[in-house]
Amino acid sequence: MAAKDVRFSADARERLIRGVDLLANAVKVTLGPKGRNVVIEKSFGSPRITKDGVTVAKEIELADKFENMGAQMVREVASKTNDLAGDGTTTATVLAQAIVREGAKAVAAGMNPMDLKRGIDKAVNAIVDELKKRTKKITTPSETAQVGTISANGEAEIGKMISEAMQKVGNEGVITVEEAKGIQTELDVVEGMQFDRGYVSPYFITNPEKMVADLDNPYILIHEKKLSGLQPMLPLLESIVQSGKPLLIIAEDVEGEALATLVVNKLRGGLKIAAVKAPGFGDRRKAMLEDIAILTGGQVISEDLGIKLETVTLNMLGRAKKVLIEKENTTIVEGAGKKADITGRCNQIRAQIEETTSDYDREKLQERLAKLAGGVAVIRVGGASETEVKERKDRVDDALHATRAAVEEGIVPGGGVALARASLAINKLKADNDDQRFGIDIIRKAVLAPMRQIAENAGEDGAVISGKVLDNDDYSFGFDAQSGEFKDMVKAGIIDPTKVVRTALQDAASVAGLLITTEAMVAERPEKKAPAGGDAGMGGMGGMGGMDF
């Protein structure tokens, strides 16, 4: 086991704070509409230019192990805020730095760290309650667009596109962000359920120009196993021919005689039919087939459930208004499933999302939920160069998460105003002792840091700006760093999602509280490398001359 280096009290905290400052100073320059860019070296390709706090934080690794621990703990603040709210990472970092600095001074002055932390926690809870009271719910698409615009650093096109996407696919729908091939940024919406399997044979195509199979009001047979012969389902096929409706078969595979018979019938025009393979693999395939069955009001034909192909009747099949099958995708539009069943299934998937610990599983479950609940929208981000596209994609991702958070928990005035105003709620708090009172005061000072930093990034004096804002009694009154004017933030469309502000403060206070109460640090001592003994070793080779062979 390697030797360890151990540091205590003031020495340990000093190193920690140096690491916190190094990381926070690099991250905080990106805050606000006039925030600056950070250029990050890449091991290959061109450097990455970003204004995304968490991207900067994730790149920082320091040589000194003790300083690095401090930096990594603040990086954890940014990552956690990003995971929970999707935005507000820079605000969280600025808050954490402010709390740690003030807290370290208090500990150095001989105050009890545990009482300080209790005071900090009390103040944070009071501010969170105040934010909830002051929250305004989002109701119109234009408000949704405003939130998106602010998180995308003032790019109105992005805000508008996100608002449009959310209107089309609903709050549960999946909105993905991809890099576009050209300069334009586009929005592409797929309504209904889409899965990544296309037609089994090109003979099923109904529109040769577009290379798609288009089925109107089809019956949908959902079969869990392979179909290699059609003998068991002949009675069912006859019923479908009599109904005059098309048939879509979704099965593990359709092969051999079954495929040949279906193709021949399709070409003769006796039966309008198409077949696709079932999406997913293993247990996920079963779950997705069940989703399709619920969406279309049909049943999964599975021997596990005791249903055989011979016994299948028309009322066991699913229905949909339209099915569009391309080479690699199938889209089911307006399935005939009961609304109550679909809602029940959605709630079941939501419960699974809450329980799962795997990010991959969570992502797949969210995709399934979106396909059932609304649809899928894709925002394709364009730009003149690869570097620009990557930078814009970062901003679109942030804006998307912020907009979702705003719809979920509502909005408060932006530009650091909500936190600064909420600090006034702390004045009524009672502390058990002087050290706790000082902990409460630490938060009162720290919550002004984001507003000051936004002003400083815009070339103004942060202390003067925050003083002027707090002197005004209007709750929404703040400083617009973009125009350099004082105004009503909500009317000007400068708003923050409550969830983002709340999460940033709670995460920052949580990690900063741990840093303040740190008394010892243990790190691996760097091994001293022995000097390279090449010359001496080679000199020793001379002895070989005296050997007897």
Curated annotation (Swiss-Prot):
GO molecular function: ATP binding; ATP-dependent protein folding chaperone; isomerase activity; unfolded protein binding
Organism placement in taxonomy: Bacteria, Pseudomonadati, Pseudomonadota, Alphaproteobacteria, Acetobacterales
InterPro entries named in the record: Chaperonin_Cpn60_CS (IPR018370), Cpn60/GroEL (IPR001844), Cpn60/GroEL/TCP-1 (IPR002423), GroEL-like_apical_dom_sf (IPR027409), GROEL-like_equatorial_sf (IPR027413), TCP-1-like_intermed_sf (IPR027410)
Subcellular compartments: Cytoplasm
Protein name, entry field: Chaperonin GroEL
Subunit-structure text: Forms a cylinder of 14 subunits composed of two heptameric rings stacked back-to-back. Interacts with the co-chaperonin GroES.
PANTHER family noted in UniProt: 60 KDA HEAT SHOCK PROTEIN, MITOCHONDRIAL
Species per Swiss-Prot/TrEMBL record: Acidiphilium cryptum (strain JF-5)
The protein's role, per its UniProt record: Together with its co-chaperonin GroES, plays an essential role in assisting protein folding. The GroEL-GroES system forms a nano-cage that allows encapsulation of the non-native substrate proteins and provides a physical environment optimized to promote and accelerate protein folding.
Magnesium listed as a keyword: no
EC number of the protein: 5.6.1.7
Xref: NCBIfam families: GroEL, PRK00013.1, PRK12849.1, PRK12850.1, PRK12851.1
Reactions listed under catalytic activity: ATP + H2O + a folded polypeptide = ADP + phosphate + an unfolded polypeptide
Gene Ontology terms: cellular component: cytoplasm
Main location as per UniProt: cytoplasm
Binding residues for ATP: T30, L31, G32, P33, K51, D87, G88, T89, T90, T91, G415, D496
Gene3D superfamilies tied to this protein: GroEL (3.50.7.10), GroEL-like equatorial domain (1.10.560.10), TCP-1-like chaperonin intermediate domain (3.30.260.10)
Keyword presence, Hydrolase: no
Biological-process GO terms, alphabetical: protein refolding
